[in-house]
C-alpha cells in the first residue's frame, strides 16, 4: 500500500489513522513516528529506510486487512541514523509523543516537532565541523537569476543576482549547497541536475511581496533599504522562499538570523566553476581534500576559523584597504602566534553553539563549552593588549568580555554535564535552593530514615522500633508484637505481620510523598531552570555572534601569520598599475609535496608584456608555473602572505583557467567541446584586468584546426581583450606571435636530454623552446623501446619531407593554407565577371534571381 494515495483512513486502527494523517502532511519525506523507546517507520517509508540504513524490514500486525511493513530504530541512537540519511540527501520529520499515556484515551497525542533536512541541520553530530553547510534557493526570470544562501548554524544569510548561466554555475560551485530549493517551473534544470538535496517548491513561495513581508518580519524592519537589497527583486524571491522553508522545518523562532547581505560581483575576484575546479582550492580534481590550497593553508585551531578561511579563499576581496588591513594584522601577530593558538584552540566552535542556543536546541555540553570559551577571553585580551595594531585592537574590542555570562554558567552548570538535560544532574548544586532540596530528598532518604528511627526510639523508649520501606506499602515504622501495645496514639496502623505491627505517622507520610515525587520534581525543575538559562543568554545573542565572528577572524589571521612564518611567505605589494611582478615565485601546494627543493621562477606581466607564450616539454612544469601565478594572486587577494621572494600586483577582476579537460559524459560533451565552451566563456567575459591561464588550446582536434583556433584565441586575448595571459602551447608556430603583435613575449621551460634519459630543469627562461622532447617523455613513461625506436624513425622521415615544419611562418594569409583548398562558388565566379555600373534596374533584378539559383 502507498499511504500517499490512501486518503480514507477509517478502515485502519486508531493508531494507524493517527500515523497516516501525520504522514499525509509530509508525503515526500521520511516520518520517524515515536512509539515508546523506538522511532517506527511504516509502509513505503519502512521499505526505503531499510534500504538506506541497512536495517531489518518487519511486519506489524495488519491494518485495513493488510500486513504493515515496519522498520524501527532505538531513540537513543537516532542521531547516528539521521546523520546517515542527511548524508544521502534525505529529509526526516521527527514525530514525538506530546500527550501523557496515563491520561490519554485512545492513541497518545503526537505531533511533528522538527524536520531535519540536509540544509537546515544544526546538530553537532550531523555537521562536518570544518565545512559550511548551506541551504540555498534559486529563482530565474527573463533578466537573470536570483540566488540566496543561509547557513543556519551561524545565521549567515546572503543573496546575489547572477546575470547569466555561467555566473550562476560558478555560484553553485562556490557555495556547494547541501540543499537547493527551486521553483516548480524552473527552466534551466540542466544547471542543477545531479546536485544533492534538490527540493521542488510551489511558485507562490517565490512571490516578491510575500518575500519582503517575511524578511521584514524576521528582521523587525519596515523595509530592506538598510540591508542594501531593496531593489534586488530576483534575489529577494529566492531569499523569501528560503526563509519560509526554514520556518516550516525548524518550527521555532530564528533570532540568530538578524540581517541579509548582498554579494556583488564587483566586490570580489570572480572565478567561474572551471577555475575553482582547476585551481583545486578546497577540493582536488578527484573530489578529495588532499593536496589542495586549503590543505596547505588551513592550520586554524577552531572549526569556525577553518570555515571562514575557506570562505575567504572562495571569495577573494578586491578592496585593497581591507587587504592591507589584513596584511598589517598578520605582520603584527607573528610574534604572538605560539601564545595565541593554544588559547584559541580552547574556544571551540562558539558560532554553531550560538545557533543551537538561538534555536533552543543547545545541549548541556554546549553550554559547558560556551562557558569554557568565555573563560579563555581574559587571557586572549591580555595577550592582544600589547599588540600595537589598530585592526587587532578593533578585533579585541569585538571579542567582548561576557564576565556576567561566564559567572552565570559557572554557577549554573556542573563541570562535566551529561549529554541530555532529561538525564538530570545538569544544574550545579547551590544554584537553586528548591532544586537542592528536591535532590536532597531523592538522594538523602536513608539518612533521614536513620535519624527518624533514632529519634522515635528515644522518644518512645521502644528498643524494637525500626523504620523501613517496601514497594507496596511505602515507608513505615515497625514495632514488635510484644511492644505494640506501647505504640503512641499518633501511630496509625498500616500493616499487621505475624510478629510485628507496622505504622505510619503524618510526618513520615508527608516525607514519603515528597520522596516519591522528588525525583520527578527535581527533573522538571531542572528542565525549567535550564530553559530559563536560555532566556538569560538570548538577549546577548547579537553581541555573542559578533564575538564568535571576531574570534574566528582572529583564528584565521593568526593562522596566516603562522603559515607565513613557517612556509617562508612574503607580504605582497598592491599597486594601481596593471600587471603582476613576481620574484622567485613558488607553487604553494607542489612545494609541500615535493621530496626535493622547488625551483622558484619569476614572472613579469604588464601592459607592455601582457601575454606570455609558454613552450617546453610535457612534464617540464608549464601547468605548475601557470597555476602558481593564479594561486599567488588568489592568496594576495585574501590578504595572505604569498610563496615568493617579492610580489607586486595590480588590479585583478577575474581569474580564468582553461587547463586540462575530460569528457563530460553526463552532458554528452566531448573533451574538445568542454574545452571550447570554457574558451568561449573566457573570450566573452575577460577584461584587461583579468588573469587568464590558457593551457594547450586546440589539442582536442586535428592539428590544423587546433593551431588555427589557438592562434585566433591568442590574437584576440592579446590585441582585443588585452588581458594578462599565460598561454601554454605545444604549437611551436605560436612562438611567431611576438614578432607580429605588441605586448606578447616567449618564455620556455627547458630540459636536458642524454641518450634515452631526460632531465627537466623546471626553470623559466626567456625565448621559445628549441624542441618538445615528446619521445623522451614517452620513454620515461615506459612506452616499449621498439615503439620509441619506430617513432624516431618516423620523425626523421617527416622532418626530411618538411625540414622547416617547426619554423613554418604562420600569418594571416598563410592560415588559410592550413585548411583544405575549396572550389570557388559559381555565384562568386559570376560576380567576379559582373560590371554593376552597366546594369539597368531590370537587369539587376534578373541578376539577383540568377545568383539565388547559383547559391
Curated annotation (Swiss-Prot):
<dbReference type="InterPro" id="IPR036187">
    <property type="entry name" value="DNA_mismatch_repair_MutS_sf"/>
</dbReference>
<keyword id="KW-0227">DNA damage</keyword>
<keyword id="KW-0234">DNA repair</keyword>
<dbReference type="GO" id="GO:0005829">
    <property type="term" value="C:cytosol"/>
</dbReference>
<protein>
    <recommendedName>
        <fullName>DNA mismatch repair protein MutS</fullName>
    </recommendedName>
</protein>
<dbReference type="Pfam" id="PF00488">
    <property type="entry name" value="MutS_V"/>
</dbReference>
<dbReference type="InterPro" id="IPR007860">
    <property type="entry name" value="DNA_mmatch_repair_MutS_con_dom"/>
</dbReference>
<dbReference type="InterPro" id="IPR045076">
    <property type="entry name" value="MutS"/>
</dbReference>
<dbReference type="GO" id="GO:0030983">
    <property type="term" value="F:mismatched DNA binding"/>
</dbReference>
<dbReference type="InterPro" id="IPR005748">
    <property type="entry name" value="DNA_mismatch_repair_MutS"/>
</dbReference>
<keyword id="KW-0238">DNA-binding</keyword>
<dbReference type="Pfam" id="PF05192">
    <property type="entry name" value="MutS_III"/>
</dbReference>
<dbReference type="InterPro" id="IPR036678">
    <property type="entry name" value="MutS_con_dom_sf"/>
</dbReference>
<dbReference type="InterPro" id="IPR007695">
    <property type="entry name" value="DNA_mismatch_repair_MutS-lik_N"/>
</dbReference>
<dbReference type="Pfam" id="PF05188">
    <property type="entry name" value="MutS_II"/>
</dbReference>
<dbReference type="GO" id="GO:0003684">
    <property type="term" value="F:damaged DNA binding"/>
</dbReference>
<dbReference type="Pfam" id="PF05190">
    <property type="entry name" value="MutS_IV"/>
</dbReference>
<dbReference type="GO" id="GO:0006298">
    <property type="term" value="P:mismatch repair"/>
</dbReference>
<dbReference type="InterPro" id="IPR027417">
    <property type="entry name" value="P-loop_NTPase"/>
</dbReference>
<keyword id="KW-0547">Nucleotide-binding</keyword>
<dbReference type="InterPro" id="IPR007696">
    <property type="entry name" value="DNA_mismatch_repair_MutS_core"/>
</dbReference>
<comment type="function">
    <text>This protein is involved in the repair of mismatches in DNA. It is possible that it carries out the mismatch recognition step. This protein has a weak ATPase activity.</text>
</comment>
<dbReference type="GO" id="GO:0140664">
    <property type="term" value="F:ATP-dependent DNA damage sensor activity"/>
</dbReference>
<dbReference type="Pfam" id="PF01624">
    <property type="entry name" value="MutS_I"/>
</dbReference>
<comment type="similarity">
    <text>Belongs to the DNA mismatch repair MutS family.</text>
</comment>
<keyword id="KW-0067">ATP-binding</keyword>
<dbReference type="InterPro" id="IPR000432">
    <property type="entry name" value="DNA_mismatch_repair_MutS_C"/>
</dbReference>
<feature type="binding site">
    <location>
        <begin position="616"/>
        <end position="623"/>
    </location>
    <ligand>
        <name>ATP</name>
    </ligand>
</feature>
<dbReference type="InterPro" id="IPR007861">
    <property type="entry name" value="DNA_mismatch_repair_MutS_clamp"/>
</dbReference>
<dbReference type="GO" id="GO:0005524">
    <property type="term" value="F:ATP binding"/>
</dbReference>
<dbReference type="InterPro" id="IPR016151">
    <property type="entry name" value="DNA_mismatch_repair_MutS_N"/>
</dbReference>
<dbReference type="InterPro" id="IPR017261">
    <property type="entry name" value="DNA_mismatch_repair_MutS/MSH"/>
</dbReference>
Amino acid at each position: 500500500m502507498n499511504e500517499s494515495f490512501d486518503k480514507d483512513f477509517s478502515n485502519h486502527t486508531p493508531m494507524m489513522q493517527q500515523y497516516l494523517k501525520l504522514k499525509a502532511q509530509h508525503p515526500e519525506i521520511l516520518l520517524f513516528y515515536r512509539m515508546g523507546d523506538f522511532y517506527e517507520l511504516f509502509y513505503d517509508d519502512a521499505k526505503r529506510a531499510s534500504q538506506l540504513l541497512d536495517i531489518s524490514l518487519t511486519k506489524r500486525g495488519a491494518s485495513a486487512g493488510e500486513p504493515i511493513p515496519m522498520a524501527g530504530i532505538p531513540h537513543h541512537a537516532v542521531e547516528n541514523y539521521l546523520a546517515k540519511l542527511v548524508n544521502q540527501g534525505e529529509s526526516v520529520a521527527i514525530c514525538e509523543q506530546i500527550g501523557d499515556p496515563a491520561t490519554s484515551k485512545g492513541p497518545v497525542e503526537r505531533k511533528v516537532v522538527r524536520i531535519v533536512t540536509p540544509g537546515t541541520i544544526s546538530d553537532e553530530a550531523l555537521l562536518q565541523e570544518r565545512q559550511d553547510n548551506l541551504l540555498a534557493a534559486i529563482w530565474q526570470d527573463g533578466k537573470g537569476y536570483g540566488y540566496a544562501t543561509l547557513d543556519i548554524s551561524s545565521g549567515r544569510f546572503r543573496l546575489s543576482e547572477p546575470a547569466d548561466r555561467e555566473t550562476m554555475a560558478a555560484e553553485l560551485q562556490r557555495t556547494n549547497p547541501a540543499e537547493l530549493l527551486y521553483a516548480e517551473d524552473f527552466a534551466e534544470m540542466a544547471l542543477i541536475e545531479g546536485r544533492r538535496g534538490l527540493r521542488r517548491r510551489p511558485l507562490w513561495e517565490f512571490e516578491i511581496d510575500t518575500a519582503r513581508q517575511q524578511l521584514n518580519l524576521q528582521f523587525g524592519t519596515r523595509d530592506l533599504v538598510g540591508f542594501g537589497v531593496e531593489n534586488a527583486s530576483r534575489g529577494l524571491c529566492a531569499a523569501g522562499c528560503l526563509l519560509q522553508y526554514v520556518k516550516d522545518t525548524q518550527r521555532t523562532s530564528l533570532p540568530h538570523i538578524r540581517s541579509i547581505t548582498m554579494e556583488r560581483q564587483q566586490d570580489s575576484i570572480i572565478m567561474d566553476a572551471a577555475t575553482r575546479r582547476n585551481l583545486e582550492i578546497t577540493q582536488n580534481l578527484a573530489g578529495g581534500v588532499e593536496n589542495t590550497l586549503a590543505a596547505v593553508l588551513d592550520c586554524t585551531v577552531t572549526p569556525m576559523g577553518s570555515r571562514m578561511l575557506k570562505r575567504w579563499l572562495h571569495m577573494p576581496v578586491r578592496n585593497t584597504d581591507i587587504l592591507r588591513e589584513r596584511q598589517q594584522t598578520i605582520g603584527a601577530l607573528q610574534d604572538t602566534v605560539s601564545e595565541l593558538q593554544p588559547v584559541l584552540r580552547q574556544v571551540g566552535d562558539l558560532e554553531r553553539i550560538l545557533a543551537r542556543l538561538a534555536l533552543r536546541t543547545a545541549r548541556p555540553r554546549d553550554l559547558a563549552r560556551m562557558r569554557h570559551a568565555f573563560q579563555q577571553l581574559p587571557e586572549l585580551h591580555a595577550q592582544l593588549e600589547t599588540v600595537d595594531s589598530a585592526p587587532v585592537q578593533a578585533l579585541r574590542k569585538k571579542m567582548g568580555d561576557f564576565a556576567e555570562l561566564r559567572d552565570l554558567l559557572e554557577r549554573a552548570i556542573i563541570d562535566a554535564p551529561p549529554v541530555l538535560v532529561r538525564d538530570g544532574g545538569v544544574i550545579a548544586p547551590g544554584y537553586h535552593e528548591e532544586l537542592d532540596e528536591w535532590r536532597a530528598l531523592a538522594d538523602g532518604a536513608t539518612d533521614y530514615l536513620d535519624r527518624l528511627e533514632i529519634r522515635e526510639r528515644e522518644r518512645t523508649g521502644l528498643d524494637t522500633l525500626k523504620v523501613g520501606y517496601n514497594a507496596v506499602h511505602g515507608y513505615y515504622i515497625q514495632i514488635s508484637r510484644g511492644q505494640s501495645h506501647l505504640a503512641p496514639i499518633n501511630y496509625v496502623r498500616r500493616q499487621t505481620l505475624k510478629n510485628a505491627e507496622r505504622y505510619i505517622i503524618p510526618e513520615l507520610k508527608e516525607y514519603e510523598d515528597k520522596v516519591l515525587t522528588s525525583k520527578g520534581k527535581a527533573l522538571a525543575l531542572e528542565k525549567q531552570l535550564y530553559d530559563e538559562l536560555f532566556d538569560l543568554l538570548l538577549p546577548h545573542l547579537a553581541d555573542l555572534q559578533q564575538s564568535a565572528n571576531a574570534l574566528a577572524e582572529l583564528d584565521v589571521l593568526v593562522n596566516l601569520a603562522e603559515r607565513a612564518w613557517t612556509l617562508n611567505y612574503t607580504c605582497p605589494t598592491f599597486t594601481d598599475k596593471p600587471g603582476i611582478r613576481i620574484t622567485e615565485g613558488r607553487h604553494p601546494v607542489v612545494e609541500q609535496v615535493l621530496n626535493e627543493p622547488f625551483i622558484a621562477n619569476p614572472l613579469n606581466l604588464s601592459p607592455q608584456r601582457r601575454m606570455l607564450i609558454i613552450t617546453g616539454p610535457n612534464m617540464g612544469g608549464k601547468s605548475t608555473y601557470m597555476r602558481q601565478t593564479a594561486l599567488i594572486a588568489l592568496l594576495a587577494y585574501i590578504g595572505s602572505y604569498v610563496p615568493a621572494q617579492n610580489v607586486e600586483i595590480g588590479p585583478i577582476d577575474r581569474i580564468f583557467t582553461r587547463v586540462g579537460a575530460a569528457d563530460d559524459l553526463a552532458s554528452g560533451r566531448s573533451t574538445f567541446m568542454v574545452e571550447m565552451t570554457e574558451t568561449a566563456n573566457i573570450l566573452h567575459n575577460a577584461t584587461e584586468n583579468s588573469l587568464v591561464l590558457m593551457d594547450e588550446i586546440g589539442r582536442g582536434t586535428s592539428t590544423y584546426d587546433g593551431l588555427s583556433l589557438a592562434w585566433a584565441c591568442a590574437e584576440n586575448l592579446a590585441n582585443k581583450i588585452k588581458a594578462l595571459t599565460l598561454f601554454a602551447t605545444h604549437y611551436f608556430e605560436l612562438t611567431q606571435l611576438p614578432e607580429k603583435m605588441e605586448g606578447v613575449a616567449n618564455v620556455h621551460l627547458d630540459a636536458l636530454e642524454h641518450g634515452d634519459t631526460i632531465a627537466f630543469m623546471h626553470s623559466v627562461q626567456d625565448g621559445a623552446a628549441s624542441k618538445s622532447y615528446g619521445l623522451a617523455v614517452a620513454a620515461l613513461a615506459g612506452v616499449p623501446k621498439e615503439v620509441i625506436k619506430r617513432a624516431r624513425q618516423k620523425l626523421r622521415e617527416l622532418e626530411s619531407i618538411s625540414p622547416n615544419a617547426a619554423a613554418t611562418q604562420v600569418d594571416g594569409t598563410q592560415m588559410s593554407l592550413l585548411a583544405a583548398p575549396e572550389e570557388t562558388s559559381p555565384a562568386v565566379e559570376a560576380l567576379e565577371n559582373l560590371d554593376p555600373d552597366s546594369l539597368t534596374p531590370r537587369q539587376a533584378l534578373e541578376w539577383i534571381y540568377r545568383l539565388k539559383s547559383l547559391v
